[in-house]
């Protein structure tokens, strides 16, 4: 009787844990941004994101370049989970940034929490 109760308790805990694993991955954090000016107003971005992807049900699914007014200038879609690659870096080339923008923010998004992780601000002054 005791063994049966212990087995049921272990099974219940395992089921609850597997259903809630997506919560434990946390929010997606931008940990590094490298910007390379290619020509007047055109840049290449390499962005490193840290997130505890657990699979298709919870993963970092994109990062975005946002101006100071909250307008999304460009989006880099992440097409699959990075379960065995943490942190990971992905690039986006040929990003056109209007000349009047001197500072922007790079933020990451995940499929459960959406936004809320660490962002990185980038100063573009002197890069033109």
Language-model segments: what does each one mean?
Residues 1-10:
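Bacterial N-terminal signal peptides that target proteins for export
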Residues 26-61:
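Short, surface-exposed binding/anchoring microloops in extracellular/periplasmic proteins
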Residues 118-128:
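Short beta-strand elements
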């Amino acid at each position: 009787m005791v063994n049966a109760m212990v087995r049921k308790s272990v099974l219940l805990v395992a089921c609850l844990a597997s259903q809630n694993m997506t919560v434990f991955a946390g929010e997606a954090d931008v940990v590094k941004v490298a910007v390379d000016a290619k020509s007047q107003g055109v840049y290449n971005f390499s962005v490193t994101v840290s997130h505890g992807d657990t699979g298709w049900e919870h993963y970092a699914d994109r990062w975005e370049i946002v101006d100071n007014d909250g307008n999304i200038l460009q989006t880099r879609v992440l097409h699959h989970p990075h379960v065995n690659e943490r942190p990971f870096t992905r690039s986006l080339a040929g990003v056109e940034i209007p000349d009047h923008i001197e500072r922007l923010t790079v933020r990451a998004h995940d499929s459960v929490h959406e936004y809320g992780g660490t962002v990185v601000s980038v100063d573009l002054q002197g890069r033109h």
